[in-house]
Amino acid sequence: MPQVLNYASSGVRGTAAAALYARDRQGPKFAFQHLIYPMIDDRTAVRKDLHPCVGEFVWTQKNNYFGWRSLLGEEPGAADVSPYAAAARAADVSGLPPTYISVGGLDLFLEENLAYADRLSRAGVPVELHMYPRAYHGFYRATNARVTRQAEHDTREALRRFLHG
């Protein structure tokens, strides 16, 4: 049975780290990773040039700074942050499993997710990115919202395509 990595938000740090660690240590070959509005770059917590419309709902830059500071035990944005803590810090993203990323257009993590998807694609990793306009961080929790139902449908279809061709 194919092994699939799936997690949302800050939990993605562990998911993306597991994919990197497995690749680096010749661990299990994951068939697919599904990253839901992933929190993968500590540098977002200290950026001053963020788009003014992102990060205003649910997960703010202040929350993000606290989260990264708590995880790292030091200032986010330092030069020596491990890619196993912040996957966007990986120098090499080749050899990672096919990846599906879903993120809202108002999510604080939008820009880091777009950049990570671009890096994966340039490294030859099959990647599918869905950006849901006007959706904020955590929108999957609004289970009856049309955008959430669409995102869940898109996820199921991507999983089917990645696993069954």
Predicted features, each with a name:
Residues M1-G165:
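Alpha/beta-hydrolase superfamily serine-hydrolase fold, recognizing
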